[in-house]
Amino acid sequence: MFENYRTFETTYAGRPVKVETGKTCGLANGSCWVRYGETVVMANVTASAKPREGVDFFPLSVDFEEKMYSVGKIPGSFTKREGKASDKAILASRCVDRPIRPLFPKDMRNDVTVVITVLSVEPDNSPEIAGMIAASIAISISDIPWNGPVASINVGYVDGQLVLNPTLEQRAHNDLNLTVAGSADKVVMIEAGANEIPDDLMLEAIKFGHAEIKNMVAFISDIQKQIGKPKFEFESMELDHDMMDKILDQFGDKLKYALDTDDKTVRDARLVPIQDEIVETFSEEYENLPDIIGEVMYKAQKTIVREWLYNGKRVDGRGIDEIRPLAAEVVVLPRVHCSGIFTRGQTQVMTITTLGPVSDAQKLDGIDEETSKRYMHQYNFPSYSVGETKPSRGPGRREIGHGALAERALVPVIPSVEEFPYAIRCVSEVLSSNGSTSQGSICGSTLSLMDAGVPIKAPVAGISCGLITKEDGSWMTMVDIQGLEDFYGDMDFKVGGTKNGITAIQVDIKVDGLTYDIIASAFEKTHKARNYILDEVMLKAIPEVRPTVSKWAPKMLTTKVPVDKIREVIGSGGKVIQKISAECDVKIDINEDGNVFVSGLDLAKAEQAISIINTIGNDPEIGAIYRGKVTRLMNFGAFVEIAPGKEGLVHISKLDKQRVNKVEDVVTVGDEIVVKVMEIDDQGRINLSRRDALADIEAKKNAE
């Protein structure tokens, strides 16, 4: 029945890989299963028979489907179905899309869809890496034109050694999470988060990963030779070369004048009448020109701008390694916890940081081992930031990707929960965009976090590097690309980091790959630019982290109780902890390990709650002073509750410094008084003294 069923086996990073084709999904253009250890993914690729009408781009979509059954979970949603793609799945889709997209024919407009379905997950073997391999195989053996194959790999840095596809245990103490995708001779995608890794070590890690990628690419190429289908002929949508030559000859000077300004608004205004004039001049000769004028204008501008850049001219007059004018500001909003605005040319980003209790950490319901994250970064890109009108539909893949990059850049410098027991949310609002908004988000977030009093280990800045290549193989790179240079260039090499090293990388390319020399040049230029931004702008706006959090932020205190005392702190049905929360106006979170987090706007009340919790969680100490509540009066003394469930007796002789005839003369039920623990007998009964507590407090005041 399955006469086309084939299997192929190899090893990758020392672990077995098995590829199966010809058994399932027979109607897709290309399909395969990849088993990487016990991680199993299925990839299917399909293409439309005809090109899509009215588009000037290649319509590729990539979906990475996380199935909860792959990790033995039932979805937590009301419907118990997988819902919209998680952020992690979207990021995985982007990590497949970016390497494969530049390898499709530039003039093809047929819809192509790649669907990667995660069927089984072994934590040691990444489904994202297996998914990239599966997608590459599915496209390679299909009849869809493509200049692959490619593969990807994860590189870690564990205990001073570079590691390929680190295991779950190794990832727990890993200083580098680098994903590299490559072809047989070039690097086509880089995505990284790192603990301040030096440039030279990062380049070494890329080369280390690429060496193993070459083996997988050779394996996929061999599969393609054995079972690959002939590639179909497609209708080329390439623009008429003669038409483009005529337009550039007649309107080249006007286009150059329109483009030669550092003001995006002025440039756009200048281009509108030129576009209308081109249509009016050539529409009789080329009847379809009104339908393709957008693509014509794109290609004409691209030709001019690329030639300028290669020869060292930038539209805003900057040098190749010159950064746009910069500005940084903090405390821009009065009642938020903290805020910062970072401006680079016509790109402006405002980041607001909000601090909350640790329980506000984001809960993650996915196939990953991670269940929550305490530091969250979200990026918003409204249409007004580029002067357009468009309805707000919530964050798209681009916004999620940019937010994740800024988050990765800051995570290595965020203090541990023990050092700073808060959940932290940064929101970057793009106010104006002319390129490199994600890097502006990194800078704005650093300003905001420092303003918030978050003791980050080092300030982080972000910068991008662009690329122009020629057909003869020559190339040049430029730092701090603006929108036009990103749009018409070949690369957006985004790097975030401190003065000590790199914390995040994201590389998008439009060519068939990067050489090591190009990557080294990008590292060198971004490193210098990062240091300049930090020294000359950001650290002048806020030289060091605020010593305290904002008065509007909750005050957070921590303590730890023995695990066997957690039940007492919580109380039956939560009565004890609810009572403490209500009386002290605080929020209390208790972890399974006994760590307790108390948050509230009033520091004194938070300290009171901590004192009560410590009293419950730890046996009363002889000689310690507590504040308790009088619960009962007897002829011989008063019973005082120093913590929920812990009561002691203040004998009438120890109620006051003077002789007391009646207990009621000194205290009544409900009074709060200070008491000192004098004795705990064999039966656990606590003897207290108000007289000694008052004497100790008075002696301490006199000593001060």
Q: Which sequence ranges carry the predicted segments?
A:
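Mobile "lid/hinge" segments at catalytic clefts and subdomain interfaces of large enzymes
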Residues: 143-259, 449-547
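Extended amphipathic alpha-helical scaffolds
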Residues: 1-48, 235-369, 554-568, 576, ...
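Glycine-rich, flexible beta-strand/loop modules in the N-terminal catalytic cores of phosphate-handling
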Residues: 28-112, 118-125, 184, 191, ...
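Long, basic N-terminal domains or extensions that often function
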Residues: 1-235
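Flexible, glycine/charged-enriched surface loops at secondary-structure junctions
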Residues: 106-112, 147-149, 216-234, 265-266, ...
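Conserved phosphate/anionic-ligand binding catalytic regions in large, soluble enzymes, centered on
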Residues: 30-32, 125-143, 330-353, 434-454, ...
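Flexible glycine-/small-residue-rich
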Residues: 36, 45-47, 64-66, 116-120, ...
